[in-house]
Amino acid sequence: MHLLLLSATDLEINETATWLNNHTFGLNALKPKLLIGGIGQLQTAYALQNQIRLERPGLVIQAGIGGATEKEEIGKVCAIGSEQLADLGVMEKTGFMNIFEMGLENRDRFPFRDGKLDNPYRSLLKWTGLPVLDGVTVNEIRSSDLEVFQRNPLRVVESMEGAALHYICLMEKVPFLQIRAISNMTGDRDKSRWKLREALKSLHRELVVMIQKLEIADETLLRI
């Protein structure tokens, strides 16, 4: 099976890349490929779409760090069950209105379901053994401007690329996972309080476990 490991930056995947270079895979076994998609939705969307057209993967795993709305999540690794475009809309005097509330998009038009980009591969999510949380994708976060999160579930994970993964893989019908290690609270710009190193170590550890499990996994795991 062709496995595509997607990350926004080298930093998030470097340790796993080194491990892969020193790991021996069987001739007919897992065939992993790394792709650095770049920061943000546009770069990620282009890189992922282009790679799928060049060589369709059996599974895409997007791996990276993220922020969380709950302090207890810091240092943990989770799988993302659904994504929302948290700041795509208009800030009115009365508050933020997303594209669905504005009537610009149907909240149930595929690949959206009630305004969310769900990962339908529930068996795959369960197989990870990780807590499954909701994700929100943003273009900008300011410590004093968290209105977008007030409209979402209490326990959410923030990134700048997650929705691009979900949207493209849903449209292309490619199985996918989004794995996030929580390094900080959303809106906290004081990096002295971030647990970046710990998050990266935890992310690498879970990715290695996941790849080793995939080497012996039945491909029926990738069915909806």
Give residue ranges: language-model regions.
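Metabolite-binding pocket within alpha/beta catalytic cores that recognizes anionic/polar moieties
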Residues: M1-R109
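Hydrophobic/aromatic beta-strand patches that form the interior of the parallel beta-sheet core
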Residues: L35, I61, C78, P131-V136, ...
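Short loop/turn motifs at secondary-structure junctions
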Residues: R56, E73, P131, K173-P175
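Mid-sequence, gly/pro-rich, charge-dense loop/helix-turn segments that line enzyme active sites
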Residues: T69-V157
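Generic non-transmembrane alpha-helical segments
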Residues: P120-L130, I168, E206-K213
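A C-terminal functional module that forms or caps the active site or interfaces directly
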Residues: T137-G187, K191
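Regulatory input/activation interfaces that engage signals or partners
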Residues: I182-I224
